[in-house]
Amino acid sequence: MKKIFLKIVLLLILANVGFGDIAQNLGDYYSINKGKVYYGNEILEGANPKTAELIGFSLLKDDKNVYYMGKKIKDVKIKNFEKLGKNYWKNDNKIYYRDEKIENADIISFKVLNEDYAKDKNHIYRGSEAIDSSLSGKIKDPETFEFLPNGIIYGTLYGKDKYNVYYIKNKMLNCFDSSYFIYEVKRINKDKVEVLNNWFIKDDKNIYFEGEILEGLDYNTFEVLPNGDGKDKNRSYEYLPKDEWRWF
């Protein structure tokens, strides 16, 4: 009898609490607790806990608004919202990366490459910024550009379009600014290219270091070492800037 009584009490408690009162961690400091949506310890006033979902880094959407880091993004018409990929979304013919509008993006050809990169027929974007819009280099056909498998490595990128293979380096200009420099990899077979690490790539005939052929290398015995350097049967290839290449 006592067991039956305890079960009834437990069921009544659960019925009164309800699922809406159970704390739920959505991620990136967002949570739902007691029918309220929180960012950290702050209540997001007006946010709907029944429809709130995390759609990107610190990016939350419900049936009325989109929030970034706990702040409502202005001028969003939620009925026209479309998620394009993690961190990228569209609203009223405007493309956004997180909370930033991508100026002059081509809506028709826009495509998300991964959570931090996208493209349209004119540009490649990191976040909301075009990486090929300066004199640091150009990608001949952005519309057909794709990253190579394993081609996104920290500040180093490898990709190709229907014409060329590209080595893309993000270089620090000073303590606060960086810029992408884009180099066409010459004489490479774009249909046989393979990324070995952030310094070395290869095709069916040659090994390339930061986008340039390593001359005199023994192709068949070349391998990448655990520390990232390379070696063949004759010597080791230690990473240094291009004007200081050293082999032993």
Predicted regions and their residues:
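Classical Sec-dependent N-terminal signal peptides that target proteins to the secretory pathway
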Residues: M1-D21
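Non-catalytic tandem-repeat scaffold regions and their flanking low-complexity/translocation tails
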Residues: D21-F248
